Amino acid sequence: MNVAEITAKAEVLLEALPYVQDFRGSIFVVKYGGSFMDDPDPAGRTRVARDLAFLAAVGINVVVVHGGGKAITRAMESSGLKANFVNGMRQTDEATIAVVKKTLDEVVNRDVCDAIGGAGGKPKGMPGDSVLVCQKLTTDDNGNPVDLGYVGDVTEVKVKLIKKEIADGFIPVISPVAEGYDGKPYNVNADLVAGRVASALRARRLVYMSDVPGLLANPADPESLISTVKVGQIDDLKKKGIIDKGMRPKVQSAMRALQEGVQRVHFIDGRLAHSLLLEIFTDKGIGTEFVQ
């Protein structure tokens, strides 16, 4: 390595310094999802885990909410159950919720925790229904009546339990399952869970990691990334089709989180090496940030 390369590395560290100083002690909620979670090559998951461990090492209080839809589908197939979807939402009967909870808590959550632990972090797996309360979902996104079975909408986050783990030096890793008013587990949308958790914890940042670079003005052109979106622009972007159906739950959650005190929400590509660090600790960033 020559002097120029060494100096360039030092410049990267110096660019990160003011962000590290500013964010120390802040809460960041990271929604960990996307196809890279299912990639047979563990390199992508390892990179993300190292980024999460790095955030914790520099004094940022990280809370992780993970998805796991593909793992659930595989587990259902192995159990002889058929996955049915209504407007993108999984119908969940008693047999299905048992598979959902077992897969999320005992397989996906454990895998995420193992990856973070392997990177030097201190993860603490938290079954979602130990910290999330929900009501049964009775309408779809358009307000039409719908019965999806054991599918809920989070109404309460048990902040004290999560903050206790943070105070004890852990990275809470929460699965998207909530306890219903009837005491039974319910399947809940992980994107919406991340937003509710961020709002309840008064998080400084909410970061969504998925399979796209962020919000694209032209979905066919990865170079058309929109770096910053203000809440007031969102309706227009929906009308133009820039915010499509697949992105709407994330954007809806981002809007609500911003309205409830989260300072910024970021959409980044989890497949890109160290995208989390590049978004948080560089001046330009690498994804799309949503602001008030």
Curated annotation (Swiss-Prot):
Pfam hit, one: AA_kinase
A GO cellular component entry from the record: cytoplasm
Compartments reported by the entry: Cytoplasm
Pathway stated in the Swiss-Prot or TrEMBL entry: Amino-acid biosynthesis; L-arginine biosynthesis; N(2)-acetyl-L-ornithine from L-glutamate: step 2/4
Stored CDD domains: AAK_NAGK-C (cd04250)
One annotated GO biological process: L-arginine biosynthetic process
Name this polypeptide is given: Acetylglutamate kinase
